[in-house]
């Protein structure tokens, strides 16, 4: 159980907006204050102010070490998953998060279910969830400090299973193949499909979504989620049933571009080196770049690529709804210094 004494809580409240490095150098004059834990909380709250505003608004929340804060979902991406699950899961009685972590996604998704199971191997993170759950109004959760494979074997039928496999190996190095993530969802695939109608996998945006769809052979929707034009998450909706719309959805803030999953990337791609003066140059956002279906982009928005391998597009027409950045073409020049 996570406990902070009154002196430590007072120190956190009094110095919440101060520079953590300066506080560490200053130290404290009393042994009543757990300074390392206090600094962790101050740093966590400062990150949560922008990343997790609803958590930051609750004084009793206890935060994990900085690395966990950096790696956790933002409130924006967690809410996106919540909306996705509400569309796909018409019945929302039971859910299980088999890789609980800090619990941002779990606590967001659990709000819409009658019962939710949080599974996490790290005892410290389990203790944090035991403390933060009631603060967040979650009184219907079961916390299990166990390995997910063992829990999955004994788990009753669920309406939703959520998993966020770790994208680092035992040495802390990044991995970029689905089979290298832990837990290995490929080896658990059959059990997962038997245990839940909907399985939502959160993966690194660095993974090749085409390869993941091929390997799993049960993906019904793909969601590439970016915020601020930076890809944050790759979400795969899996099921043994024909649920969902079969699309790849590229999302960046309010921009959304979807296309059928089976679309060949460059089918319909139109190219031209002709540039219209006073026309417009278009650059797709990061999510669309990751999606890679530029032929569909040409068809939907009537743009042409500057080259077969170019990711810049032109059109004589201004399109406010293009999923990316727009520029008016004022002049055209070669790389000749005198022309420039």
Each PLM stretch: what is its role?
Residues 1-340:
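SAM-dependent transferase fold signal centered on methyltransferase-like domains
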């Amino acid at each position: 159980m996570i406990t902070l004494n009154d002196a430590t809580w007072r120190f956190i409240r009094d110095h919440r907006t101060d520079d953590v490095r300066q506080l560490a150098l200053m130290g404290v004059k009393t042994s009543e204050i757990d300074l390392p834990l206090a600094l962790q909380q101050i740093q966590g709250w400062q990150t949560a102010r922008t990343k997790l505003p609803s958590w930051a608004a609750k004084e009793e929340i206890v935060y994990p070490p900085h690395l966990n804060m950096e790696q956790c979902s933002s409130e924006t991406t967690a809410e996106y998953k919540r909306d996705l699950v509400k569309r796909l899961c018409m019945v929302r009685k039971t859910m299980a998060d088999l890789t609980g972590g800090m619990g941002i996604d779990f606590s967001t998704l659990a709000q819409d279910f009658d019962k939710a199971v949080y599974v996490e191997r790290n005892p410290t993170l389990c203790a944090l969830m035991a403390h933060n759950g009631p603060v967040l109004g979650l009184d219907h959760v079961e916390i299990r400090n166990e390995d997910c494979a063992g829990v999955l074997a004994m788990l009753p039928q669920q309406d939703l299973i959520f998993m966020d496999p770790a994208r680092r190996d035992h040495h802390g190095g990044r991995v970029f193949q689905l089979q290298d993530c832990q837990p290995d969802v490929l080896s658990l695939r059959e059990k997962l499909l038997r245990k839940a109608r909907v399985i939502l996998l959160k993966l690194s945006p660095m993974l090749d979504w085409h390869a993941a769809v091929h390997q799993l052979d049960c993906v019904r929707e793909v969601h590439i989620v970016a915020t601020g034009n930076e890809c944050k998450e790759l979400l795969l909706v899996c099921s043994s049933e024909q649920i969902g719309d079969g699309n790849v959805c590229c999302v960046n803030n309010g921009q959304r571009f979807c296309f059928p999953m089976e679309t060949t990337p460059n089918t319909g791609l139109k190219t031209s080196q002709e540039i219209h003066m006073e026309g417009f140059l278009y650059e797709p956002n990061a999510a669309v770049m990751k999606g890679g279906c530029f032929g569909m982009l040409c068809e939907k928005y009537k743009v042409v690529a500057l080259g077969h391998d170019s990711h810049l597009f032109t059109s004589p027409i201004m399109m406010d709804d293009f999923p990316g950045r727009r520029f008016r073409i004022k002049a055209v020049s070669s790389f000749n210094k005198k022309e420039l």
